Amino acid sequence: MPHPQIVADNAPSLTAVLFGLSGCLVDFGSTAHANTVPAAETLATPGALNILQWLNTQGTPCAWLDELPCAVTTPLAAALPGWVHGCRPATAPWPAPHACWQALMELNIAHLDGCVLVSGEPRLLQSGLNAGLWTIGLASCGSLCGLSPGQWQALDEQAREHKRAKATVALYGLGVHSVIDHLGELGTCLADIGLRRLKGEKP
């Protein structure tokens, strides 16, 4: 049997990774609204900057998507590296696939193979599924739990596990390909998708 690391090294590289903005890269609990941006929510979520840095070293194009107006997304995205592309809202709202396709076109991506969407927002994940992308749902970080980092940490372990499990079931119910807790776990998940692609699996 091949060594897992050898298999992972032979896995095809990623073509592009799309992220939700609010409730994924920033705004842990997806609490920003059309007219309000809580100051704490402009901070990058756990693991976000590290995984973006890693993807950049791999030469993987990345972009974020959101349906909030520019007056909200601009301050939200301020904590992110400048090379991460911010996409204009698509004319067709989620869960239509147009936003994902538009984002890939803005990144000059010519094909869907190896393209991944990461989000904690069910409607955006549905958009990714409809677009033919690999999709990774975030259980604790996003609108399904809807808690700020402080509120999340204030819960006891049993309450956190209950919310996490409920969100995980809901995400798999959408049909997503993988579910992780937060972006700190994304590297391992992307490696797993690489192995699945190596075996011929399609999204």
Predicted regions and their residues:
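Nucleotide-state-sensitive switch-loop elements of NTP-binding domains
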Residues: 62-64
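Conserved phosphate-coupling serine/threonine residues in phosphotransfer and NTP-handling enzymes
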Residues: 66-68
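Asp-based, Mg2+/Mn2+-dependent phosphohydrolase catalytic module
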Residues: 1-31, 37-43, 49, 53-60, ...
